[in-house]
Design a protein with these regions (language model features):
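Acidic, glycine-rich active-site loops and adjacent beta-strand->loop/helix elements
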Residues: 175, 242-243, 337-339, 431-437
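Soluble metallo-hydrolase cores and metallopeptidase-like ectodomains found primarily
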Residues: 30, 118, 124-161, 259-400, ...
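Extracytoplasmic/secreted proteins, especially bacterial periplasmic and envelope-associated proteins
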Residues: 41, 45-48, 52, 67-78, ...
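Structural recognition of the beta-strand scaffold that forms the well-ordered cores
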Residues: 51-54, 96, 146-148, 168-172, ...
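A glycine-rich helix N-cap at a beta->alpha junction
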Residues: 448-457
Length: 457
């Protein structure tokens, strides 16, 4: 029997928000069942590959993570099924990178200025081994005098070995370039947006991440200055601001490529704040001249390096050319397989998309900014529309379907297409890791090529 109550129930079921209903015009299905691919490059093939590469199970494919390890295994399996030859190490498709984490080990780091001992944190932080600063992995300085060395990067000033040998050189500034982090690194005005449907949370979280990167020294450019090392300095101190983000980062391992042995064995380096610098010399650093001497310091700490449990690795395969006279010439196709992993906080998919559509149409190329009233109204309308269709979907996984899942699937599709066409020249397909961490995989391949680079056309 049909009743008004049953009709109302059916109507409610039909109009209630559903997570599987699309909101955006270009939104694809939430899931995609893998299907057999074909030599031609087709939308179905691209979806089949992309839905696997960017799946939540890959956990954002951060370099050295289990997710990226799984993604590289998938890529190698595709190469294997296509009949491509392994071109990695030891007869495999893989080229491992010595990627891992530097972490402080042993007793807590200590810096003694005169007779005052400071724990690492708000006033100073020891630096992990680094190519830009030339810093070593450990410090065991005992009552070593300090000498002011001027501004880091000012190579017009020559450091006299007679003054600096066996001493601790103190620079204003350090290897990180001020301002290089980008115009959208800190957007405090975004945090004051009204809390509407989570739109402000999406913006504030993005601003917080960028500000955290700025504070902890994660910046895309760095200066090199090896004058202190060349002058025989026993250690290096950089006078720079220190805040809570930078201090907290010292207590946790940070993933990085290990530096050369000669640099790991180089002089230890640390950042000190302006107050500590004043204690060293008895006056502000801005009033010092190169060669001014300060009090002696004692500094002890030790970093150790460990490779990731799931190795960071490139995936490399060769399609051998069909023409014997040209098979020794290679055409190289590459894309990076990694992304940025998992955020510390979850944001709502639809809120974030609404904010980015309105305020950042060019994606990361647009700075984080406060929406105009008109933009805020548009954002609110978009999110209200989304809420009428489905509930919020909070997520912390940065899936990387576009960056660079799209490039990865095109690499695989190109490999399948060319494998069916038997080109005259050989082709080498390189799936790099570590692009997001600073082009690490591509640099490692060019520094340690598995074929002669001059054979690449």
């Amino acid at each position: 029997m049909t009743s008004a109550a049953s009709v109302s129930a059916v109507s409610a079921q039909q109009t209630a928000p559903r997570a599987d209903r699309p909101v955006w015009p270009d939104e694809g299905p939430r899931t995609w069942t893998p299907r057999a691919t074909e030599p031609a490059i087709t939308p179905n093939d691209l979806r089949t590959r992309l839905y696997q590469i960017a799946d939540d199970s890959m956990q954002g494919r951060n370099i050295g993570s289990p997710g990226d390890f799984e993604a590289t295994a998938y890529i190698a399996d595709v190469f294997r099924r296509l009949g491509l030859q392994p071109a990695g190490e030891n007869g495999t498709y893989f080229q491992d990178l010595p990627y891992g984490a530097f972490a402080l080990q042993g007793p807590a780091p200590r810096l003694t200025v005169g007779k005052k001992t400071l724990a690492a944190g708000a006033r100073w932080i020891p630096l992990a081994p680094d190519a830009a600063s030339g810093s070593g992995a450990s410090s065991n300085l005992r009552n070593v005098p300090v000498v002011f060395a001027g501004h880091f990067g000012d190579t017009s000033v020559v450091l006299d070995p007679a003054r600096f040998r066996g001493k601790v050189a103190v620079f204003i500034g350090g290897p990180r370039v001020p301002g290089a982090q980008g115009s959208g690194a800190a957007a405090p005005s975004c945090a004051s947006l009204p809390n509407r449907f989570g739109a402000d949370a999406a913006i504030a979280d993005d601003a917080r991440i960028r500000a955290s990167q700025k504070a902890s020294g994660v910046r895309p450019l760095a200066r090199r200055d090896e004058r202190a090392r060349a002058a025989g300095a026993a250690g290096v101190l950089f006078v720079e601001p220190i805040d809570a983000f930078a201090a907290a980062a010292v207590l946790h391992p940070r993933g990085t490529m290990p530096v050369r042995d000669s640099l790991i064995a180089g002089p230890p380096a640390a950042v000190i704040d302006s107050v500590t610098a004043h204690q060293l010399f008895g006056k502000p650093a801005g009033e010092l001249s190169v060669g001014d001497a300060g009090v002696a310091v004692t500094a002890t700490w030790r970093y150790s390096f460990s490779v990731s449990a799931t190795p960071a690795r490139n995936v490399i395969a060769i399609l051998r050319g069909s023409d014997p006279t040209r098979a020794s010439e290679y055409v190289l196709i590459s894309a990076h397989n990694d992304h940025v992993g998992v955020r510390s906080e979850a944001v709502d998919h639809d809120s974030l998309r609404a904010v980015n559509m309105v305020t950042r149409p060019q994606g990361a190329n647009d700075p984080v900014c406060r929406p105009t009233p008109e933009q805020q109204h548009e954002i609110d309308s978009l999110i209200a529309h989304a809420r009428s269709i489905r509930p919020p979907r909070r997520d912390s996984i940065m899936n990387g379907a576009d960056d660079d899942g799209s490039g990865t699937v095109l690499l695989l599709e190109a490999a399948e297409k060319f494998a069916s066409e038997h080109p005259a020249r050989s082709m080498i397909f390189v799936s790099h890791t570590g692009e997001e961490a600073g082009l690490l995989g591509s640099k490692w391949f060019t520094d340690h090529p598995t074929i002669a680079l001059d054979s690449v056309a």
